[in-house]
Amino acid sequence: MNALPVTILLVEDDDVDALTVERCLKHAKITNTLVRAQDGVEALEMLRGTHAGTHLAAPYLLLVDIRMPRLDGIGLINEIRRDPLLTRTVIFVLTTSDADRDKMAAYDAHVAGYIVKTGSSDQF
């Protein structure tokens, strides 16, 4: 049985950080399609099929920053967990925040992992 290709949705408002993630994925030879949303609102639109330009077909994996305008990462994750069509989405937090409160909020929302951005592709 062939598995469907997994699309990676990067939810990141910072252009430099988004480019760094893209380079790290290439360095790790991860060739999955990478799509970017600027914030949580745009990500939800893409996931729910209401975005004007992009609709993602499952399966997908999310890499979500915590600090973003309009709808932050924790708010996005909580919205996804409340949506019966999205609740099983695999989500990793990818952020510069090493704060315990952010880690607790993320794990309370059942993320698969919490990665602190270091700028090093080796740690990614």
Name these PLM-found stretches:
Residues 20-23, 36-61:
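Acidic, metal-coordinating helix/loop segments flanking the phosphotransfer/catalytic sites
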Residues 12-13, 93-98, 118:
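Conserved active-site segment of CheY-like receiver
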Residues 42, 119-124:
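C-terminal output helix
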Residues 112:
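Short, glycine/charged-rich "phosphate-handling" switch motifs in NTP-dependent
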